[in-house]
Amino acid sequence: MRALAALLLLTSVAEAEPVTLRMAAIAPDGTEWARSIKAFARDVESVSKGELKVKWYLGGIAGDEMVALERVKHGQLDGQAGASFCQRLAPSLRAARLGGLYQTREEVIYVMGRLKPVLDEEFRKSGFFNLGQAVFGADVLFSRQPIRTMEELRATRLWVWSLDPIWQQMAQEMGFHTIISSIEEHSPLWRKKSYDAFFTVPSVALAYQWSTETAYYSDFPATMLPACLVVSNAAFDPLPTELKQILQASAAKFMNRFNEISTQLDEALVNGLFEKQGLKRASVPPELRAEFYAAAKRARDKLGAALIAPALLSSVEKMLGEFRQQRREATKR
């Protein structure tokens, strides 16, 4: 009898329908991001031998990040990859978006790694399983004219993404004249000369072809843009343990690859590819750099808990101090 029950159980498992996770991202199809996303889906299906599949809706087909998030909550999608929505689900991730706090991509990756247990729990409480974090990159300045002083930057109309509340608050507190709109409205407003400059990640400017419409870029890291990959608890929890492990392992490979690709692409763009497109590289005077970071610190201090819990900011600053000290000691060896 036990043998018959075991046989029936095995037959039931063998005949089980493959599970398909419906995922969304606003990454335009044909970009390096989209290719990495599709490679992740292929890896999941291959390793699971077809038992688990990931179907992606790219290029904003499922709506912007907030619309897609609502669709996940209503069961129309199972997960999402992106940037702005991540901070809504895991508020501590706002620490990675604070302007003027980080000098390199590696610093953000280090901090997010240290915060991962906290982030995992915040995602879980919001109804999601955290498959991983990554970094799109550092926002740099694109403009119609070269900007060499803080006074010139404050006098310039500056575009800010409507789904980026942390940078919106900081930019306004720093005295910038902000024009807020969606990504879809970015190019039409630029062509109408509704604004004259914007901060964004180099690979983002390339993906949305914004770099073909501007004239100058200045390479100094103003803010960092973190990313995440999540699946709803409702979709993740029922998965067999083996499929959960496969999904997590494939996601880890994807996030590592995402960081590598983003780093390589951004470095190539700011070190020559943009200039081949016709952009001119505007130098960043030390005074502008110093004044920008000083203004960013004043904004962080003044906004306080409106941006991030003071205790979390203090903890992150301590982490950064430790990381930078480790790097200094390593260079002396």
Residue spans for each PLM region:
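N-terminal secretory/targeting leader peptides
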Residues: 17-107, 123-333
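Hinge/lid segment of periplasmic solute-binding proteins
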Residues: 111-127
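Sec-dependent N-terminal signal peptides
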Residues: 3-13
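Short amphipathic alpha-helical segments that mediate assembly, nucleic-acid/protein binding
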Residues: 2-3, 313
